[in-house]
Amino acid sequence: MYLLSKARKKGMPFFATPYYLSLLDITGKAYDDETIRSYILYSPQLVETYGSIRAWEKEDVVEAGKPNAAGWLLPDGHNIHRRYPEVAILIPDTMGRACGGLCASCQRMYDFQSERLNFEFETLRPKESWDHKLRRLMNYFEEDTQLRDILITGGDALMSQNKTLRNILEAVCRMAGRKRRANARRPDGEKYAELQRVRLGSRLPAYLPMRVNDELVEILREFREKASAVGVKQFVIQTHFQSPLEVTPEAREAIRKILSAGWLITNQLVYTVAASRRGHTTRLRQVLNSLGVVCYYTFSVKGFQENYAVFTPNSRSMQELSLIHISEPTRPLYIS
């Protein structure tokens, strides 16, 4: 409580759903909850450095009218992040700029520090100007010759209300259709890359799986049908399960519903110290794979002094990879 009090005095937000807090062992005797406990409760180093945290990735530093470190000229504002030729991140001006919980190792902690991302839900509701801005952001994807993959995140993509999320997905679908029709008029050798994959980044399947209601599933199903007709081939919910403790009956039902809409679920494991203990991630992969979740990415904690307490050396990540049998279907495809 001392650390939380100190964090509050520094203006550092703390947010977790009652559902997720209920997964913690408050007795300290029933089971080992360190993986999820260290994910939402802050270390002394994080609290101490809050206020001076900077973007870990130089590409995430955006100045109006100037290319970022990767050489991409981006629209004004902080809605689009881009590091690679074929993919860009879209952060909507909606409640998607909040999360179901603030992860202690969050890659966008500097955005919470600047309050571009926050938990003041009323202030995050989309304003009338958002629809106009969304059209302008879609123009960026439509007019780019290389982009074929859009990752809608935040914050958390599923924090947006169903109506708002539907509007965003419909805008993406219209953009993909226009880009495809424009390509039909272009000669060979001058055609643009068409949208192939749409991803929604969300940790709500773990933080608040009840968010995956029937209306959301129908929105996902309808979008998949419409977007498939204009050439989109992959539909992915990209999530973070850290521990088998998170795979509750509610989470299993959320996974089942998403898969029933024809979307793929992929898991990015954030390789914290607690998650890196031998045997822990193996069990997590077994559980998720049995439910149809693809465990494809092990994410090394980035940052500086603020994440010292949860950083796992990359050598441990490589050791984990080497211990997984080649024939094992749970083997992650990437380590970053």
Locate the predicted segments by residue.
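Flexible, acidic/Gly-rich N-terminal and inter-domain linker regions that tether
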Residues: M1-Y84
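Single conserved hydrophobic/aromatic residue that forms the stacking wall/gate
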Residues: I324-I335
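Active-site glycine-rich loop that binds ribose-phosphate moieties when present
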Residues: E122, E128-N139
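Conserved aromatic-histidine-acidic binding/catalytic patches
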Residues: L4-M12, I80, R125, D156-S160, ...
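Canonical Radical SAM [4Fe-4S] cluster-binding loop centered on the CxxxCxxC motif
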Residues: R82-K127, L200
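Conserved AdoMet/S-adenosylmethionine-binding subsite of the radical SAM
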Residues: L134-E142, G155-L321
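Catalytic micro-motifs at enzyme active sites that drive phosphoryl/nucleotidyl and oxygen chemistry
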Residues: D76-I80, I91-M95, L137-Y140, P187-D188
